[in-house]
């Protein structure tokens, strides 16, 4: 073992610049003599020599001469600055020699000399325009470098156009705005009826002025037609059912019941994947608009007729404020192949949900698309409501048809604000933001309503776009205590 040394010896020892090979390997305190004392004690003084250090890699490093030149140049520059500061301080009495920091008002004052002389800046850093000449693009002549910049500009214009916020100047509609309105209608009053407001807001989901495939409505005919760009100008007028130009959906629409007869397993799905096209959400929303119009504006009950327009206005406002802006942003870069993949993933997920409901005894369950179209109902749901499977799945049916008026308003509020994109907090929901708990009145086959506690779970795709909503309903039986 190595001999222990006292504290005094440790203090008297002085470090050396380079140890011998033996002391370096054994991590011993070496001395300047050769051979050193450690090697002499071990009778290996013949082999005692200085340890050779490894040469540092100099690749990518500045040569020593270059470093010295840089240091010398920096030192000369500092000396020049010091001389200039002293001369300036000598000419101004009371100056402390410290650099004067300009205020914010000085920085934005065009009449004051710039803080940095433009002659010292490279040509690429000199702004060719003055501070007053720079402004945001407001006309269609300008172009953005990316779709994301265009979408962000659209959202800013949308914020400026919100109620209660006055615009500082007249705004000209741009080709980058997916829901731009004419300039003459900038200060026009709001629609006189809630259905006009709903049609106006529903148009936000159908227009595709940013890109060819930005909207919800990519029907099967979009794969065959080559005149899609020429139809963009007429999409706004097609929101109303009277002037709508769309194919006969009943002839092309494949009901969930018929589709399940053809595709019963994942193998069948991939075998017929070339025959699967993106879902026609545009036609679905138009039919949903007719249902909401009939429910809220054509009610026979006097109280329902009075509250109907207000409730319809609330639904439209919820779609416009919470759902449409985020949806347009997420779908701005989607192409036809993405929409087809979206439909394939939806059908594959639906098969998994169906198998899950058959393997376990679950509470009544119903699955529908983001548009509200029912895709699947469990046996327990059929037993609870009294409707047959063919009644629910043989034609296009919406989950809103089985709620009362207040339930429809609550559903749209929960879906748009909390469930679709998990964009809002503060409601009773799961930690991952994919499910919410609520109550609703569910329609029975005898036209009566049954109060149910429900949980709505959303399934999103890789683009964070909602595909399916799974609703589970647990009946609540009120017991009368007498």
Swiss-Prot record:
It is found in: Nucleus. InterPro entries: ERT1_acuK_gluconeogen_tf, PAS, PAS_13, Zn2-C6_fun-type_DNA-bd_sf, Zn2Cys6_DnaBD. GO terms for molecular function: DNA-binding transcription factor activity; DNA-binding transcription factor activity, RNA polymerase II-specific; RNA polymerase II transcription regulatory region sequence-specific DNA binding; zinc ion binding. It holds the Pfam family PAS_13. CDD domains: GAL4. Residues 20-48 bind DNA. The keyword Zinc applies. Keywords: DNA-binding, Metal-binding, Nucleus, Transcription, Transcription regulation, Zinc. Its main location: nucleus. One of its GO terms (biological process) is cellular response to starvation. GO terms for cellular component: nucleus. Residues 350-422 form the PAS domain. Transcription factor which regulates nonfermentable carbon utilization. Belongs to the ERT1/acuK family. This is Glucose starvation modulator protein 1. It comes from Eremothecium gossypii (strain ATCC 10895 / CBS 109.51 / FGSC 9923 / NRRL Y-1056) (Yeast).
